[in-house]
């Protein structure tokens, strides 16, 4: 019973704050991913990918970057997806458009990938808000193929991974800062011949060179 009461109080407080304390949402200025560099050190994106209008509408992203960055070795490839959402509030007046960020763990099974390892790990790549954060680390499988995935939510000066933190900070920032903008950053590398350590080293090397470039594209 106490959990039900707490849940009802949370819903009531949520409604009050959203309705009366945060009516005019702040949309921060940022640089479009159209100008994002396609060469970072020895990594090159030669095949930027485009979403169909239907997929983009379903994701609710305002802007995105999706590309395979390749190194000098043909086996060196990092798939990058960043979806930026300038707001995660459904517009008043209805409509079916969903603006909130979709957690990757909800989408992977639908694309045929099974999550066989899942952890939350600390990250300290240069360029992260505050210099540190957390990421979810997945190993995913489809048949004999294996991939290593890092993803985190880089939003309003934080890099966080846990879904309950995402919900909590979105609620607080909407109330206190009138902002709900945020981004999902996802990096994926193939695991060749079960060499998980090699995939990890490749992803870390890429991220250390890639993450500092996000300044200006993801508002803090």
Language-model features, listed with the residues they occupy:
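A short linear-motif detector with a strong N-terminal bias
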Residues: 21-25, 44-49, 57-60, 116-117, ...
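Short extracytoplasmic
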Residues: 35-67
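A cross-kingdom signal targeting lumenal/periplasmic-facing segments of multi-pass membrane
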Residues: 65-206, 213, 217-218
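ATP/Mg2+-dependent ligation/transfer catalytic cores
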Residues: 3, 14, 36-37, 185
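Active-site-proximal structural scaffolding
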Residues: 6-10, 36, 178, 203
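Alpha-helical transmembrane signal-anchor/signal-peptide segments
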Residues: 22-40
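Hydrophobic membrane-insertion alpha-helices, especially the h-region
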Residues: 2-18
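Residues embedded in well-ordered secondary-structure elements
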Residues: 32, 56-58, 127, 174
